[in-house]
Amino acid sequence: MKLHTLRPAKGSVKTSKRIGRGTGSGRGGTSTKGHKGAKSRSGYSSKIGFEGGQMPLQRRLPKFGFKPLNKIEFKPINLDELLELIEKTGASVIDTALMNQNGLIGKNDKVKVLARGEVKSIKAEIIAHAFSASASEAITNAGGKVTLIG
């Protein structure tokens, strides 16, 4: 095999359509664009969503939804998770930094403590952005302290 005998595989290379090269080529005249209309002109591009004068889909469908700009999203943490954290670390103060170090929350998450799980005694101060009423009651009844972050 020599370099000058190399050929591409059969069927792998197609010859391009040579349009607009006279009527004898079979692709002359209108150059495969049909007769008249905007689509046959140079520089044509349709508007996105234009349906030829029919009412476009984005205008036929109703508007929906609303996203409040000042909504605060809390990461829920339950009492049973906090009890596990207290057992694991033995800390007397549970704050967002400790929760972050142990993978319960992300760095910038706001925390709301919820009341899932039974609490017999908590000898710790729990610092969070929000507490459910039942969670704060359960913590204070079990001997713990609840502190809100502003």
From Swiss-Prot:
Keyword Transmembrane helix carried by entry: no
GO molecular function: rRNA binding; structural constituent of ribosome
Record-linked InterPro entries: Ribosomal_uL15, Ribosomal_uL15/eL18, Ribosomal_uL15/eL18_sf, Ribosomal_uL15_bac-type
SUPFAM superfamilies membership: Ribosomal proteins L15p and L18e (SSF52080)
Keyword Ion transport: no
Pfam families for this protein: Ribosomal_L27A
A biological-process GO annotation: translation
Keywords on record: Ribonucleoprotein, Ribosomal protein, RNA-binding, rRNA-binding
Gly residues bias spans: 21-31
Region (Disordered): 1-51
Assigned GO CC terms: cytosolic large ribosomal subunit
Record-linked NCBIfam families: rplO_bact
Homology family: Belongs to the universal ribosomal protein uL15 family.
Function according to Swiss-Prot or TrEMBL: Binds to the 23S rRNA.
Database matches in HAMAP family: Ribosomal_uL15 (MF_01341)
Protein name, UniProt field: Large ribosomal subunit protein uL15
Organism, as annotated: Cytophaga hutchinsonii (strain ATCC 33406 / DSM 1761 / CIP 103989 / NBRC 15051 / NCIMB 9469 / D465)
Gene, per the UniProt record: rplO
